[in-house]
Structure formats: structure tokens, C-alpha cells
């Protein structure tokens, strides 16, 4: 595997049974960084059960089981390589915690692949009000995924098979919906494919001579690599803090924005502790500077392990991370059994922090499709609603405006073990905190 290629994170979304697993399985089978031995083992097992059961979805399920049993393919099982990129598929389709993982974006997706079935009735089910085609597309947009590819799947099962008319119909209906979410449709390829037969996945389909756009892999190769926000102020949400004997305090986290250099003075917020960076490591290699996307451990002098914790954020003294007295956000309610009113206090999961935050005002209810205000100061909001809401964290929490620092400005609301909603921060009222520099 040539490590020189840039890495892209791809999230695969779409309605249940529209063929996500089969499609991913087929691509992994053809391009995946899965060793031959594993593939052979799976194929032999398939032969034993009768050829028909070697479906690509079944391959994916087998790989998932292997991963859960901790077999060696754990790391590579969801990676595949194209001419230009190495792709990591975030979250295999059908994952229970799919929505939660997509939101908190532990590994933020650079692009989304939306799989829709062209089979009669199936496309319509995905587009119904409770359809996942709609829900996942809304989520992707809310979470800041601006690069989208649509795979119009099961083209072998249209009436008649390989129907251009059905493809055009889906492209029109779905295109209109995606446009209403704010996607630039001229940049969204719609690729007619069959995950089952492999048509238009890697090679051109002889069954659809009417289509002259890219194959799925060509479309994946034409995605843009994510920009590195090095010119923004430094932000490093802390994942863990270690005290290493003979070294000292070592916070660990991913640089989201800005650049960290050896010798820099940094401040950890909310505790307002200041330290000096003595060394930086990434994957056990010493480096002089760290940039966005780097997962690092850095040794700081002047700060003890007791002073800082997971959920704190490191920045430079001239532009410290913002601690919120209150923050205002655009939220979308995914699930709630009754109604949400002022006083409701879900746990806000934002960057590496999770802090209960009270709703102190529901400013407006929005049309989830257009974002326009439909009601000022509503009494309550419920499942399926979008709204502008003001929160007060019950203990100090670093929150930034989404427009300034996207990874520190999007969050999930959790309660009762479920994701209640997702949100993006539109405004922050900062808490006044004095930073003592010795």
C-alpha cells in the first residue's frame, strides 16, 4: 500500500436494504486492502454453502465478524485504494450507532456516498417522511459534509432492467431534494450502478450505453482532498492526559486547526492552565511541528496531570479557546418520545467533551428543509423539528462558532442512551476567565 497517497474518509449512507452492504462489499472485494487469504477463506466457505450465497454483503458481514473477533484484518478491513486516494469507510452500513457516530464525527468524513435503490417502491420508501434517504442526507449536510456522490443502485432490477427513464426520474426527484438542503447539484454525480453485478462500479457498464458519466471509482477519484486549516488559530481538543515518569505531563489529541510548534506556550481551557511545549510526538515519531489532522502527544512543562482532562481544549495565549457562558445553536431533533421545552437538559457531546447543558430559550422553530423561521418562541419542539435554541452548560465547556471552527461547533444531544438531536453553534456568549501567565 503506497503510503504517499492522501487519505480520505468516506461515509456510506442511505435507506435500509438499498444495497449499501453489497456495494461496499463488492468494492472491498475488488479494491480492498483485505489479504488474499481472508478472501479465499470466505470464498471456500461460500462454495460449501452453495455458490449463490457468495454475495458481497455476506463478505462484508463476514469481515465485520472477523473484526469483532479481533482477527488481524481489524485495521484494514474497511480500507480500499484507488488511483488517487486511500479511502477509509467510516462506519459500516447498518451500524446501530451509525447516527451517533456520524454526528460526533470521531473521524470526520470528507465525503458521503448516498446509495439509493432504483427498484420500484424502494426509492419511494427511502424518500418518504420517515425514510433514511432523507434523514441521512439531512444529517450529512448538517454535519458539514459538502462532497456527495449518489449511487443509483439496483439498475438491474428496474422495469425494464437498466431503465434510463427510471434513472432520470430518480435524478430529478432526489436532485431537487438535495438542492433544497443546500447542495450544489452540478457537483453531485448520479451514477447508475448495480452492486450485485458490478455494473459501473469500476468498469463501464455495457448494459447502460445511454450513460456517459464517470464510474463510481472515477467519481471517488475526482473528490477534493480536505483543506488543512493551518492559518486558523490553534485548537487541540484533548482526548487523554498521561503522566509519564521521567517526561512529565503528556496530553493527547488531534490538531483540528492551526499549527503547534515545540517551544510554544499553550493554554488549556476551561481550566486556564498555561504550559510550554517541550516535545511533540505522532505515532512514536518526534516532530517539530504538528498540523491539522495530526494525532499527537505533546509534553508540556508547568501543567500537572491533575490540572487538565479529556474535553479541555489547548490553544495559543493570543487566541485562547472560548469557554461558553451560553451558546445558541441550530438544532435538529432526531428522536424524542414527547416534547422538548425550556429546562430540558440533555448531554452535549462536542469535540472530545460531554457536558449536560440546559435549554434556556427556544427562539424559533425552522422549516427543516429550507431553514426559514416558521414560528417565533414556540412552547415546545418535538421529533422532526428544527429550531434555534439557547443552551447553558452546567459546567464550563469550550464551544466555538461552527463558522469559525467547524469541529468545535457541531454537536450531538444525548439522553436516555439515545441521540436526541444534532446541532451547529451559531453564536457563543463567552465566559470571562482570567488566564494567569507566570
From Swiss-Prot:
Q: Which domain of life is it from?
A: Archaea
Q: Which PROSITE patterns match?
A: G_TR_1, G_TR_2
Q: Which GO terms describe its molecular function?
A: GTP binding; GTPase activity; translation elongation factor activity
* The entry's keywords: Cytoplasm, Elongation factor, GTP-binding, Hydrolase, Magnesium, Metal-binding, Nucleotide-binding, Protein biosynthesis
Looking at the Swiss-Prot or TrEMBL record, what is one Pfam family this protein matches?
Answer: GTP-eEF1A_C
Binding, Mg(2+):
21
Q: Which InterPro entries match?
A: EFTu-like_2 (IPR004161), G_TR_CS (IPR031157), GTP-eEF1A_C (IPR054696), P-loop_NTPase (IPR027417), Small_GTP-bd (IPR005225), T_Tr_GTP-bd_dom (IPR000795), TRAFAC_GTPase_members (IPR050100), Transl_B-barrel_sf (IPR009000)
Region (G2) residue ranges read: 70-74
Instruction: Name the Enzyme Commission number(s) assigned to this protein.
Output: 3.6.5.3
- Region G3: start and end of each range? 91-94
Chain positions covered by the region annotation G4: 153-156
Q: Which residues form the tr-type G domain?
A: 5-228
Predominant location = cytoplasm
Give the UniProt subcellular location, in the record's own words.
Answer: Cytoplasm
Instruction: Report the enzyme's class at the first EC level.
Output: hydrolase
In the record, the note on similarity to other proteins reads: Belongs to the TRAFAC class translation factor GTPase superfamily. Classic translation factor GTPase family. EF-Tu/EF-1A subfamily.
Q: Which HAMAP family match?
A: EF_Tu_A
PANTHER family this protein is in? TRANSLATION FACTOR (PTHR23115)
Function (record text): GTP hydrolase that promotes the GTP-dependent binding of aminoacyl-tRNA to the A-site of ribosomes during protein biosynthesis.
Q: Please report the name of this protein according to its UniProt entry.
A: Elongation factor 1-alpha
What is the gene name? tuf
Amino acid at each position: 500500500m503506497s503510503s504517499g497517497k492522501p487519505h480520505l474518509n468516506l461515509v456510506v449512507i442511505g435507506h435500509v436494504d438499498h444495497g449499501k452492504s453489497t456495494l461496499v462489499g463488492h468494492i472491498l472485494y475488488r479494491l480492498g486492502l483485505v489479504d488474499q487469504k481472508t478472501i479465499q477463506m470466505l470464498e471456500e466457505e461460500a462454495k460449501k454453502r452453495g455458490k449463490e450465497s457468495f454475495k458481497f454483503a455476506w463478505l462484508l458481514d463476514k469481515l465485520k465478524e472477523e473484526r469483532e473477533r479481533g482477527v488481524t484484518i481489524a485495521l484494514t478491513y474497511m480500507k480500499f485504494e484507488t488511483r488517487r486516494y486511500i479511502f477509509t469507510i467510516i462506519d459500516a452500513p447498518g451500524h446501530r450507532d451509525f447516527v451517533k457516530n456520524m454526528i460526533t464525527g470521531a473521524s470526520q468524513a470528507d465525503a458521503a456516498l448516498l446509495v439509493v435503490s432504483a427498484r420500484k417502491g424502494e426509492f419511494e420508501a427511502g424518500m418518504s417522511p420517515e425514510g433514511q434517504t432523507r434523514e441521512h442526507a439531512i444529517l450529512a449536510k448538517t454535519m458539514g459534509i459538502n462532497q456527495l456522490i449518489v449511487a443509483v443502485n439496483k439498475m438491474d432490477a428496474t422495469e425494464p432492467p437498466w431503465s434510463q427513464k427510471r434513472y432520470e426520474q430518480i435524478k430529478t426527484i432526489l436532485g431537487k431534494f438535495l438542492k433544497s438542503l443546500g447542495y450544489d447539484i452540478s457537483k453531485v454525480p448520479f451514477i447508475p450502478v448495480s452492486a450485485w453485478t458490478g455494473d459501473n462500479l469500476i468498469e463501464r457498464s455495457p448494459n447502460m450505453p445511454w450513460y456517459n458519466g464517470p464510474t463510481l471509482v472515477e467519481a471517488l477519484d475526482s473528490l477534493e482532498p480536505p483543506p488543512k486549516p493551518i492559518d486558523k488559530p490553534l485548537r487541540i481538543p484533548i482526548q487523554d492526559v498521561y503522566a509519564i515518569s521521567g517526561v512529565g505531563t503528556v496530553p493527547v489529541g488531534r490538531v483540528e486547526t492551526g499549527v503547534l510548534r515545540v517551544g510554544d506556550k499553550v493554554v488549556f481551557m476551561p481550566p486556564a492552565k498555561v504550559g510550554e511545549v517541550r516535545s511533540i510526538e505522532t505515532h512514536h515519531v518526534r516532530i517539530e511541528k504538528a498540523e491539522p489532522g495530526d494525532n499527537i502527544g505533546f509534553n508540556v512543562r508547568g501543567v500537572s496531570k491533575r490540572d487538565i482532562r479529556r474535553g479541555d481544549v489547548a490553544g495559543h495565549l493570543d487566541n485562547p479557546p472560548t469557554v461558553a457562558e451560553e451558546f445558541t445553536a441550530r438544532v435538529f431533533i432526531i428522536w424524542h418520545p414527547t416534547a422538548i421545552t425550556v429546562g430540558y437538559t440533555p448531554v452535549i457531546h462536542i469535540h472530545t467533551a460531554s457536558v449536560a447543558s440546559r435549554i434556556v430559550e427556544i427562539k424559533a422553530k425552522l422549516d427543516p428543509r429550507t431553514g426559514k423561521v416558521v414560528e417565533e418562541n414556540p412552547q415546545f419542539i418535538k421529533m422532526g423539528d428544527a429550531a434555534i435554541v439557547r443552551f447553558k452548560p452546567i459546567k464550563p465547556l469550550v464551544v466555538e462558532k461552527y463558522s469559525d471552527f467547524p469541529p468545535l461547533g457541531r454537536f450531538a444531544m444525548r439522553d436516555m442512551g439515545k441521540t436526541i438531536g444534532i446541532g451547529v453553534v451559531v453564536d457563543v456568549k463567552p465566559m470571562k476567565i482570567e488566564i494567569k501567565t507566570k
